[in-house]
Amino acid sequence: MFVDQIKIEVKAGKGGDGMVAFRREKYVPNGGPAGGDGGKGGSIILKVDQGLRTLMDFRYHRIFKAKPGQNGMIKGMYGRGADDTYISVPQGTTVTDAETGELLGDLVEADDELVVAKGGCGGRGNIKFASPKNPAPEIAENGEPGEERKLKLELKVLADVGLVGFPSVGKSTLLSVVTSAKPKIAEYHFTTLVPNLGMVRLDDGRDYVMADLPGLIEGASQGVGLGIQFLRHVERTRVILHLIDMSGVEGRDPYDDFVKINEELKVYDPTLLDRPQIVVASKMDMPDSAKNLAEFKVKLAKDKTLKQVPEVMEISSLTHQGLKELTHRTADVLESTPKFETLAEKEQASKVYTFKEDEPAFKITRDSDATWVLSGEKLERLFKMTNFNHDESLMRFARQLRGMGVDDALRERGVKGGDLVRIEDFTFEFVE
C-alpha cells in the first residue's frame, strides 16, 4: 500500500536528575558535596532512508519516545546521556508541526537528518550549588523534560520528469517501455493508483528519474477523482511530460484535455505552469491520430495557457515510434533547467523577521474552585526541574519565584495569606 501522508507524535527523553550526595571517606571530615549531574535525554531525529518508498511503516507505529538520561551518581559521577532515537523516512519527506503548521524541514538529500524533538538537559547535582556561604548544599535539579511534538509527514516523490494527463492516455505504458519499471497496465481508468518511478538510461550516458503519476480529471484540484492526493508529487518534477491521447477513442477532444489538465495544475500551484512542459502526442499508431494532431496543433498555436507554446512530440509506445527522440529531448531540457528550491529553502528565503515581544514569564488565573493558578513556560520549566524532596531545593524555588516577581504579582491580584496557589499538579498555601 502506498501511504504519502501521516501524522505521528514524538517525545524526546527527559534529562537525568542531579543527585544530592556527600563524601564519606575516612580521614576526610566534612567531605562536602559529591552529587553528580544527570545525563542528557535522547533526541528524536528523522533520517532519510533511500530504501523506503512510502510512509506505510508509520500506519501502525505513530508514537515515538526517546530514552531518558541516567541520573547523577555519588562521588561526583555524571549520568550517562541517552542515545538519540532515529526514525527512517523516505527521501522527499516534508515535516510540518501539526499544531502550528510551521514547516520544520524538507528531507530531499540522501544523507539529510532533522532533529524534531530535543532531549532535555540533565539536572545539576549538589556539587554545582556549593558556595562559600553554603559549602554543603542539599540542592539538586531534576532533569529537563524532553520536547514533545505532533508532526505531519508528507511524501512528495522525487523525480526529474513527471508524466501527467487524463486516465488511460498511455503514461504507464510509456514508463514501462523507456524504463525497467513494471507499473500495472490495464484498459480501465485509474489503473495507476500510486506514483511509479523508473530510471531512464540513454545510450549517451545520461540518465534521469521519470514518475508516472495517477491520472487527473477535471476538478482534481478540488478533490474530484483521486483529487489533490497525487498532485503534490508534481511539485518535485523539473520537467512535465503532458501526455494527450490523439486517437480520440475516449470521445474527448485532445485540445480540451490539454486546457483542463493545465487548469488543474494552475489551481493547485500556479508556478507549475512556469516549468518546462513537453506535449507528448500518444497513440499515434491509431487511425485518426494524425488528423486529430493536425487540428490540435492549430488550436495550440493560439493558446495562451502557458508563457510559450509547448513543444509537441509524437510517440507510439506500442510501435516505439518517437521514443528515442522524446527521451533525448527530455534530457536536453533537463540539462538547461535548474533544480527547484526545496520547501525549506523557499521558507528561509521568504522569511520575514518582525519584532515580537517576549511572552511573560508567568500568568495568573483563577480556577472555578477559587484556587489561584500560575502558568507560563519559564515558570513551569523551573517547577519541573525543582527537586521537592529536599527543603533547600524548595526554598531555592521560592526565592526564584520571588525574583521573578510572582509574590508581588499575586498580592496585586488580591491574593491573601492562606489562599491556595497551584502550579500544574502542586498546590500550596500563600504565606505573607
UniProtKB/Swiss-Prot annotation:
<keyword id="KW-0547">Nucleotide-binding</keyword>
<comment type="function">
    <text>An essential GTPase which binds GTP, GDP and possibly (p)ppGpp with moderate affinity, with high nucleotide exchange rates and a fairly low GTP hydrolysis rate. Plays a role in control of the cell cycle, stress response, ribosome biogenesis and in those bacteria that undergo differentiation, in morphogenesis control.</text>
</comment>
<dbReference type="Pfam" id="PF09269">
    <property type="entry name" value="DUF1967"/>
</dbReference>
<dbReference type="InterPro" id="IPR036346">
    <property type="entry name" value="GTP-bd_prot_GTP1/OBG_C_sf"/>
</dbReference>
<feature type="binding site">
    <location>
        <begin position="190"/>
        <end position="194"/>
    </location>
    <ligand>
        <name>GTP</name>
    </ligand>
</feature>
<feature type="binding site">
    <location>
        <position position="172"/>
    </location>
    <ligand>
        <name>Mg(2+)</name>
    </ligand>
</feature>
<dbReference type="InterPro" id="IPR006074">
    <property type="entry name" value="GTP1-OBG_CS"/>
</dbReference>
<dbReference type="InterPro" id="IPR014100">
    <property type="entry name" value="GTP-bd_Obg/CgtA"/>
</dbReference>
<feature type="domain" description="OCT">
    <location>
        <begin position="354"/>
        <end position="432"/>
    </location>
</feature>
<dbReference type="InterPro" id="IPR006073">
    <property type="entry name" value="GTP-bd"/>
</dbReference>
<dbReference type="InterPro" id="IPR015349">
    <property type="entry name" value="OCT_dom"/>
</dbReference>
<dbReference type="InterPro" id="IPR006169">
    <property type="entry name" value="GTP1_OBG_dom"/>
</dbReference>
<comment type="similarity">
    <text>Belongs to the TRAFAC class OBG-HflX-like GTPase superfamily. OBG GTPase family.</text>
</comment>
<feature type="binding site">
    <location>
        <begin position="212"/>
        <end position="215"/>
    </location>
    <ligand>
        <name>GTP</name>
    </ligand>
</feature>
<dbReference type="GO" id="GO:0042254">
    <property type="term" value="P:ribosome biogenesis"/>
</dbReference>
<dbReference type="GO" id="GO:0005737">
    <property type="term" value="C:cytoplasm"/>
</dbReference>
<feature type="binding site">
    <location>
        <begin position="316"/>
        <end position="318"/>
    </location>
    <ligand>
        <name>GTP</name>
    </ligand>
</feature>
<comment type="subunit">
    <text>Monomer.</text>
</comment>
<dbReference type="GO" id="GO:0003924">
    <property type="term" value="F:GTPase activity"/>
</dbReference>
<dbReference type="InterPro" id="IPR027417">
    <property type="entry name" value="P-loop_NTPase"/>
</dbReference>
<keyword id="KW-0460">Magnesium</keyword>
<protein>
    <recommendedName>
        <fullName>GTPase Obg</fullName>
        <ecNumber>3.6.5.-</ecNumber>
    </recommendedName>
</protein>
<dbReference type="InterPro" id="IPR031167">
    <property type="entry name" value="G_OBG"/>
</dbReference>
<keyword id="KW-0378">Hydrolase</keyword>
<dbReference type="Pfam" id="PF01926">
    <property type="entry name" value="MMR_HSR1"/>
</dbReference>
<feature type="binding site">
    <location>
        <position position="192"/>
    </location>
    <ligand>
        <name>Mg(2+)</name>
    </ligand>
</feature>
<keyword id="KW-0342">GTP-binding</keyword>
<dbReference type="GO" id="GO:0000287">
    <property type="term" value="F:magnesium ion binding"/>
</dbReference>
<keyword id="KW-0963">Cytoplasm</keyword>
<dbReference type="Pfam" id="PF01018">
    <property type="entry name" value="GTP1_OBG"/>
</dbReference>
<feature type="binding site">
    <location>
        <begin position="165"/>
        <end position="172"/>
    </location>
    <ligand>
        <name>GTP</name>
    </ligand>
</feature>
<dbReference type="InterPro" id="IPR036726">
    <property type="entry name" value="GTP1_OBG_dom_sf"/>
</dbReference>
<feature type="domain" description="OBG-type G">
    <location>
        <begin position="159"/>
        <end position="335"/>
    </location>
</feature>
<feature type="binding site">
    <location>
        <begin position="282"/>
        <end position="285"/>
    </location>
    <ligand>
        <name>GTP</name>
    </ligand>
</feature>
<feature type="domain" description="Obg">
    <location>
        <begin position="1"/>
        <end position="158"/>
    </location>
</feature>
<dbReference type="InterPro" id="IPR045086">
    <property type="entry name" value="OBG_GTPase"/>
</dbReference>
<dbReference type="GO" id="GO:0005525">
    <property type="term" value="F:GTP binding"/>
</dbReference>
<keyword id="KW-0479">Metal-binding</keyword>
